[in-house]
Amino acid sequence: MGSPLRFDGRVVLVTGAGAGLGRAYALAFAERGALVVVNDLGGDFKGVGKGSLAADKVVEEIRRRGGKAVANYDSVEEGEKVVKTALDAFGRIDVVVNNAGILRDRSFARISDEDWDIIHRVHLRGSFQVTRAAWEHMKKQKYGRIIMTSSASGIYGNFGQANYSAAKLGLLGLANSLAIEGRKSNIHCNTIAPNAGSRMTQTVMPEDLVEALKPEYVAPLVLWLCHESCEENGGLFEVGAGWIGKLRWERTLGAIVRQKNHPMTPEAVKANWKKICDFENASKPQSIQESTGSIIEVLSKIDSEGGVSANHTSRATSTATSGFAGAIGQKLPPFSYAYTELEAIMYALGVGASIKDPKDLKFIYEGSSDFSCLPTFGVIIGQKSMMGGGLAEIPGLSINFAKVLHGEQYLELYKPLPRAGKLKCEAVVADVLDKGSGVVIIMDVYSYSEKELICHNQFSLFLVGSGGFGGKRTSDKVKVAVAIPNRPPDAVLTDTTSLNQAALYRLSGDWNPLHIDPNFASLAGFDKPILHGLCTFGFSARRVLQQFADNDVSRFKAIKARFAKPVYPGQTLQTEMWKEGNRIHFQTKVQETGDIVISNAYVDLAPTSGTSAKTPSEGGKLQSTFVFEEIGRRLKDIGPEVVKKVNAVFEWHITKGGNIGAKWTIDLKSGSGKVYQGPAKGAADTTIILSDEDFMEVVLGKLDPQKAFFSGRLKARGNIMLSQKLQMILKDYAKL
């Protein structure tokens, strides 16, 4: 059974601990090392009277057994005072067991305002007050365990207990919300509905049954739910007589009873009543997101089908297998995506490129001599092809986008992305996998420039709750994630994301409101908008490229990553990297929490030698080559004269098709001057970037260099004023 569950050093507050269940909890916690605060007002089960005797007796009993405990005699309506006792005595608060309660049983017609109010004040408001007083302390220490006490009367209702039932079910709603709010701070909140003999149940249970339902048969569940190793959160449990059962909500598939552009009528409700109440193939929603998601799905069906009077969803089970199978191989409509340097720069800024790092300039300044698109900009191109609604139109796929998670991503580049261009994208459903709890749709997107394949994206999309249709679980078409090596990383780099990171990244085209709208994020179960997974993906890939390829985009071949947990803007990303040959394994963590957010990831790089897209020596016979060669020949005769006039070194970057095709240097500073292919051997005074075609236009006098500069066709850096002397060079010495 493993080692005993201990609570050494944990501070536990139990309300209503003077007798019955509360006493059993207090004794059990103390026996296992907890520091216990025994709260009890000292009144009877109707809430009448007060005194210190009940709490003192339990404290004394704990101390006799070698434990540590203090008493508190305040009403739970004064929660701050109750929690202060724990803080004053032990300096912290780890566990709150909201157990205090009273009864005022009356048939509904006989319940007075006082009967109603006092029940809610003690049970519901009292639990609220005590828990709220402990909440901030638990958040600061990143730990807390909370128990709310409901009852079978609250869950199912009971004659003569309308006031009590309402308060007890209210506690369940309170607990469910606290479970959601507290989980990021490691605060768990669960609800129990105990059946046990106590001061309260003596009035509603036979004496022999009260004796059989000992509090000691409930306490073990409470201790387990409050232990640091228990991950249960937001659960509801009935417990008694040594039996424990977990409860959950169940919902029929229901029926859509209205048509588009027609009023909904009670007659339609009546006609579909059997379907509405049919629990065959019932769903079991576990969150408000799942509940809301089904409503969104209904609205989509009404809008697309014009109205459904029958329960189409009920046919899903019998047709799911053939439906999903029919989706395999289906293609989305062809999609064209045009972009300029602006989109490439916007993306680079969105994934953390910055002027703080001079090496990033090539990704964020179009005038950089080696301006390049980050390789992972390719995911934006692939994603765009799926965002036009085509995915929802594929036969066999019924997609509720509120339940879609991005599971994994693969990107392969066949050549570096052009700095600007227009690509045609073709997307196809490569496979559909049944994972039980959901369906994985494998989408392949191929992007072409003319007929040349530029990149291949593979998106793994997980549809929550759509599994169990009997389909296959694996596929040879999936690009498989690979576990990281079992050794310390070879390199670790960190990036602190901005609070505006998601707002900036979404400008690249991912408009999902989950990443910007607090209300939408709340509906999805998050405290605030989260960062795009592909944004984190871009941060990590950029770091791998920088660390192991010196930002040479021509070496980037492929990347695969699995998305594990969300990131909040403002958190610090820690990319850990392992080099094994030309494969760089990596994982990404949130530094503040230690959570792994990208796992089983890798980047494949091309070998160092012979892999550049086109080096200067490979420039070949561009039109500009003849001009530079001619300038070189002329300098042999009149070089000293030109050097005296110019006294500068010019480095030229000649582009072709958006990429650098050749580099040339005209050295008019040393000796008799010289012209050679390649970058300047020393520091260049001026670097000039323009296309092969525009260079020829300048040489032929058809394009004024100044106008070319101000229109962006010619870019220069360094001592730009020296470029004015170029007209003399080109005009006088480059005539063909």
Curated annotation (Swiss-Prot):
Name of the molecule in the record: Peroxisomal multifunctional enzyme type 2
EC number per UniProt: 1.1.1.n12, 4.2.1.107, 4.2.1.119
Modification N6-acetyllysine, positions: K46, K565, K669, K707
Alphabetical UniProt keywords: Acetylation, Deafness, Disease variant, Fatty acid metabolism, Isomerase, Lipid metabolism, Lyase, NAD, Oxidoreductase, Peroxisome, Phosphoprotein
Extra remark: The protein is found both as a full-length peptide and in a cleaved version.
Example of a GO biological process term: fatty acid beta-oxidation
Residue positions binding (3R)-3-hydroxydecanoyl-CoA: H406, G407, K435, D510, W511, N512, P513, L514, H515, G533, F563
Phenotype for Y505A: Completely inactive
Region of interest: Enoyl-CoA hydratase 2: 322-622
Positions of transmembrane segments: none
Tissue: Present in many tissues with highest concentrations in liver, heart, prostate and testis.
Residue intervals of the MaoC-like domain: 484-600
Pathway: Lipid metabolism; fatty acid beta-oxidation
Native source organism of the sequence: Homo sapiens
Disulfide bond positions: none
Residues bound to substrate: S151, Q706, Q724
Reactions that this protein is recorded to catalyse: a (3R)-3-hydroxyacyl-CoA + NAD(+) = a 3-oxoacyl-CoA + NADH + H(+); a (3R)-3-hydroxyacyl-CoA = a (2E)-enoyl-CoA + H2O; (24R,25R)-3alpha,7alpha,12alpha,24-tetrahydroxy-5beta-cholestan-26-oyl-CoA = (24E)-3alpha,7alpha,12alpha-trihydroxy-5beta-cholest-24-en-26-oyl-CoA + H2O; (2E)-octenoyl-CoA + H2O = (3R)-hydroxyoctanoyl-CoA
